[in-house]
C-alpha cells in the first residue's frame, strides 16, 4: 500500500488520479501506523515551509518520517521539507537530506515563482531515470529550491541551477509536480513505485 500523507487539506486530486492510472493501491492518511506499514510513502506539499512543518508536528509525524526505511518521496514543498532548513519562514525542516531551501533569484526573463515547463539534466544514474533523458520536460511551481548539488540526481536551469531530483538513502525529492508532468511524470512516479521497499 502507498501512503499519501494528507495533513494540510490540500487538493490532491491530480496526484491520486495519477496513482489510480498507475494501478497503485493507496490511502490518503495522517495515521502514523498506516504510514509505517506502507510499502512507499509520498509527502506532497502546497503552502509554506512553516505550515507544512506545523501540520506534520500537529499530527505527530516528524519522528515517524525520520525513522522510515521504505522509499519516501517528497513532492514540491514536500521535497523542501526533507531538507535541513528552509529560508522561507527561517524554519528547521526534517533534516533527512543535507541542504537548505533558498529563494530563487528573480530576473526580468526569469520571474519568481518559477512556473511552467523546464527540462531535467540528469547528473547520476538512477532507477528513477529509467526510460527518461535530458530532453524530457516537467512542470514546476515554486519560489524556493535546493541550490546545492551534493545529492542531486537531476538539476534544472532557471537563470541559476537548482536541484530538481534529489536522493539520500531511501529519501527522494522532486521539486516539480510529477502528477502534472504528463507522460514523463507518470514514468517518474512509476519508477518510484517500482523501487524495492525495505519496510
Swiss-Prot record:
Oligomer status and interactors: Heterodimer of HisH and HisF.
Pfam families: GATase
Entries under SUPFAM superfamilies matching the protein: Class I glutamine amidotransferase-like (SSF52317)
Cellular compartments annotated: Cytoplasm
Organism superkingdom: Bacteria
InterPro entries reported for this sequence: Class_I_gatase-like, GATASE, Imidazole-glycPsynth_HisH
Example GO BP: L-histidine biosynthetic process
Gene that this polypeptide is encoded by: hisH2
Organism whose genome encodes this protein: Legionella pneumophila subsp. pneumophila (strain Philadelphia 1 / ATCC 33152 / DSM 7513)
Task of the protein: IGPS catalyzes the conversion of PRFAR and glutamine to IGP, AICAR and glutamate. The HisH subunit provides the glutamine amidotransferase activity that produces the ammonia necessary to HisF for the synthesis of IGP and AICAR.
Key words of the record: Amino-acid biosynthesis, Cytoplasm, Glutamine amidotransferase, Histidine biosynthesis, Hydrolase, Lyase
Entry annotated with the keyword Membrane: no
Record PROSITE patterns: GATASE_TYPE_1 (PS51273)
Pathway named in the protein's UniProt entry: Amino-acid biosynthesis; L-histidine biosynthesis; L-histidine from 5-phospho-alpha-D-ribose 1-diphosphate: step 5/9
GO CC annotations on file: cytoplasm
Catalyzed chemical reaction(s): 5-[(5-phospho-1-deoxy-D-ribulos-1-ylimino)methylamino]-1-(5-phospho-beta-D-ribosyl)imidazole-4-carboxamide + L-glutamine = D-erythro-1-(imidazol-4-yl)glycerol 3-phosphate + 5-amino-1-(5-phospho-beta-D-ribosyl)imidazole-4-carboxamide + L-glutamate + H(+); L-glutamine + H2O = L-glutamate + NH4(+)
GO terms, molecular function: glutaminase activity; imidazoleglycerol-phosphate synthase activity; lyase activity
EC number: 4.3.2.10, 3.5.1.2
Catalytic residues of the enzyme: 76 (nucleophile), 177, 179
Domain Glutamine amidotransferase type-1: 1-199
Protein name: Imidazole glycerol phosphate synthase subunit HisH 2
Gene3D superfamilies noted in UniProt: 3.40.50.880
Amino acid at each position: 500500500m502507498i501512503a499519501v500523507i494528507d495533513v494540510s487539506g490540500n487538493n490532491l486530486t491530480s496526484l491520486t488520479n495519477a496513482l489510480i492510472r498507475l494501478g497503485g493501491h493507496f490511502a490518503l492518511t495522517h495515521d502514523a501506523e498506516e504510514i509505517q506499514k506502507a510499502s512507499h510513502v509520498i509527502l506532497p506539499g502546497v503552502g509554506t515551509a512553516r505550515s507544512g512543518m506545523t501540520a506534520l508536528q500537529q499530527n505527530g509525524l516528524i519522528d515517524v518520517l525520520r525513522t522510515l526505511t521504505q522509499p519516501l518521496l517528497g513532492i514540491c514543498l514536500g521535497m523542501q521539507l526533507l531538507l535541513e532548513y528552509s529560508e522561507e519562514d527561517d524554519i528547521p525542516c526534517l533534516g533527512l537530506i543535507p541542504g537548505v531551501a533558498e529563494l530563487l533569484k528573480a530576473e526580468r526573463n526569469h520571474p519568481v515563482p518559477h512556473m511552467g515547463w523546464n527540462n531535467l539534466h540528469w547528473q547520476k544514474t538512477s532507477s528513477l531515470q529509467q526510460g527518461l533523458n535530458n530532453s524530457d520536460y516537467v512542470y514546476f511551481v515554486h519560489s524556493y529550491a535546493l541550490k546545492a548539488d551534493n545529492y542531486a540526481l537531476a538539476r534544472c536551469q532557471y537563470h541559476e541551477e537548482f536541484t530538481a531530483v534529489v536522493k539520500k538513502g531511501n529519501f527522494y525529492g522532486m521539486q516539480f509536480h510529477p502528477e502534472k508532468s504528463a507522460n514523463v511524470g507518470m514514468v517518474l512516479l512509476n519508477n518510484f513505485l517500482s523501487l524495492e521497499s525495505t519496510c
